[in-house]
């Protein structure tokens, strides 16, 4: 069987990680790297024997695509790929606005194109073991995700950091809905007006509660998930330094989604992207309102 030709949109640090995963696969080969910065695209592509370009033409001739460019560019790239019929793995957040996220998802649904969001923690072995250990016996979920500030970002701490844990909450209690959200922020950045630390509490329709904290201005790194069961037993794990490679596991799932999943399974994958983005939007609006009306 011939290798799947992969188009990589973006040439930054996250794109480089995806390139390494593709390069290690026996069933895929990196065909082209697309970036507006052609020198950067060439630098990354040359490491894997791929072509480089600043336009999407070559990408549209590939079999599957990974979108790992800056967040503001996600929507346009994804829509062009979807209209060409290419299965797409798009880094989180899916786009820079809830409106654009819905448009991308609805377009993929209309054309029945496989779409996956890069919620890589879903594939973290530590999280999978924790979820298996507790099953559905959950009373409260607590997450902490802190670390140093990224060199540059086009996303808020909610879209860039907290959204991972919002997604994990929905993975732990599938089908549940949020009935109450309370959010607070601190450490507002003077240059972009965004907070660097966010805490959030959730109440679900089932009565399950969750507390989440995200910070990207800490000298230390923590990625912890704790689950308290109805009998008050607590199960905790760290998501740092997983025993496997979550990004590689995610790419394997993307392969299955693109080649073997049924329409029902593709529908479910697409549907699972929206809840965390909708909740992130609610939190962002709460924080903005609180700052404007202290």
For the regions a language model picked out, list residue spans one by one.
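N-terminal Rossmann-like dinucleotide-binding module
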Residues: 1-48, 136
